[in-house]
């Protein structure tokens, strides 16, 4: 698949086949996602694959802050990737001071780049994804026993698509681009 084709054809998938994605495929996706750009090559993204049905259901029922669409979507996923990021590195100097006026906000920027790269790498292999950002971070952190220096960037449902979602309407270049 060509890069532009992947960018233009990738969709948020909410209905999945129940067959698991082999670990070998997941590892290839993460290996590709490791090439995502990051602040001073800090590579702060980390990936936690959740395959246990009871854990996924618990996340869906208790950790999506009553957002019913995400609950339904996650319950349909054969696996969930929790993308975390290491804190205190992206946007910082070695002495702990900020390198950018965005301060710690650059961590989420890098996590977002990693999430998009992960999703495009998955799509290349026929694996659909949906990025969710509406969740109870404290509960997920406790449930997955995440290290103290990591925060949850997003929760990505994944699996082989059971449908091909329609392409949403996109804004025109004229609406998006300004020349000065």
Task: Please identify what each model-predicted range represents.
Residues 139-159:
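Short, conserved aromatic-histidine micro-motifs
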Residues 41-111:
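Glycine/small-residue-rich phosphate/adenosyl-binding loop
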Residues 39-42, 73-75, 146-148, 169-170:
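Solvent-exposed alpha-helices and their adjacent loops that cap or buttress functional pockets
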Residues 3-12, 89, 153-180:
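C-terminal helix-cap and adjacent tail motif
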């Amino acid at each position: 698949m060509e890069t532009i084709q992947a960018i233009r054809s990738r969709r948020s998938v909410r209905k999945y086949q129940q067959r698991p994605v082999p670990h070998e495929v997941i590892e290839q996706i993460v290996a590709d996602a490791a090439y995502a750009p990051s602040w001073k090559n800090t590579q702060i993204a980390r990936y936690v694959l959740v395959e246990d049905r009871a854990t996924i259901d618990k996340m869906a029922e208790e950790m999506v802050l009553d957002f019913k669409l995400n609950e339904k979507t996650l319950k349909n996923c054969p696996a969930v990737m929790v993308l975390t990021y290491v804190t205190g590195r992206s946007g910082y100097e070695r002495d702990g001071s900020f390198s950018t006026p965005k301060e710690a906000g650059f961590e989420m920027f890098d996590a977002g780049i990693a999430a998009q790269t992960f999703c495009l790498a998955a799509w290349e292999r026929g694996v659909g994804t949906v990025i969710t950002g509406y969740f109870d971070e404290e509960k997920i952190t406790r449930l997955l026993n995440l290290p103290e220096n990591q925060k949850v960037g997003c929760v990505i449902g994944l699996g082989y698509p059971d449908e091909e979602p329609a392409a949403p309407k996109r804004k025109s270049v004229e609406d998006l681009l300004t020349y000065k």
